C-alpha cells in the first residue's frame, strides 16, 4: 500500500499558503486491510476512511464514470489495481491533481505545477464536462486565487456544458454550498464574473445576471452599472471580513434594480421592496439558511433608510430599529448596518469613505435598549393604562431617550 498527499494541501504548500485541507489517496489498499489497521469507514458514495491517529481522510484510489445527468450520476470504481495517475485523472483542475509521496516527492502527470506558475486554472481532462459542479468550483477557485485566469480551453468547455443544460441538473443544496464557499473567499466578485462569462450565472441566478447593463444615477453611483456596483459591494464585504449572512445580504440588496422599468432609469424608486421579494425567491429556490435569508430581507428593505438616517428624527429611528427587530436581535441589527456600509463604500472612488450612519444607529440602538421597559410598563399600569397604551408608553420612552442622548456631546 502506498499513501499520497493530494489536492489542496499539495497545491497550497507550493503556493506558500497554510492549509488545513489534508487529504490522502491510498494505492494498492483494500477495505479489509484498512479496517484491520484501525481505519474508520466514513464514506457513503465511495470508500473514505479516517486515519486511526490523525483522523485525516484517506480515500482508496478510484476511477469514475458518468452514468446519468447531474451531480449524482456517477459510477465509482475503487480497488487495489487503480493507479495514482488514474485517480488524479478524474480530478477537476490540474492544480488540484498534484500528489506527494511520504518521502516528499511530487507526482504531477498533468502539469499542475506549470499552471500554478502561470496562475492558470485549467481542467485535467475532457471528463471535466461530466460534472456540472466543476463549473462552480472553477468559479470559486477564481474567487480564492483572484490573480489566476481561467484557461481558454476550460472557458470554452464550461460554455459548452452550460449550453448543453448540464447546470440545469444541479440540485439546489449543491449550488448553495459552492456559492456560499465562494462568497467567503477573498475576492467573491471573481466567482460571479466567471459564472457570468460562461453563461452559468444566467441559469443559476438570473436575478443577479440581469443587473449588468442596468444604469444607476451617477451622483449616487459613480460606477453607474448596477452589476459592477454589486461586485464592488461583495469585495468590500470580504475586505471588512463580513460573515456569510452579511455577504448574502450584500448579494441580494439591489436585485430589484434589475426589474426597474426602462422608461424611469436611471432612477430606481421602490427597488427596495422589489429586492426583498426577489431575495425571498432566491433564498427559497436555493434553500439558503434561514439566518442568511432573514438578514438579506431586512437589508434589502431598509438599506436606503439606513443611508438616509442622518435626516431621520428620533421617532423615525426608533421605528427603523423596530422594523428590523432590533430589540430582540441586536446582533442582526449590527450585521444589517455592516451590510449597509459595504453597499455605501462599494462604489467607485468611495472605498475609503467614512460611513457614520453605522456607528450612529448602533448608538441609537444601545440608547433605546437601555430604557427600563419593565419600569415604564409599571408606571403606565399605575396610571391605569393597559394593553396597547403600555406599548405606546415604552415606544415614547425609547424615542425620548434617543432624542436626548443620540447627538449629545460626550460627558
Q: Would you name each region that the model predicts?
A:
Residues 1-411:
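Catalytic cores of the polymerase beta-like nucleotidyltransferase superfamily
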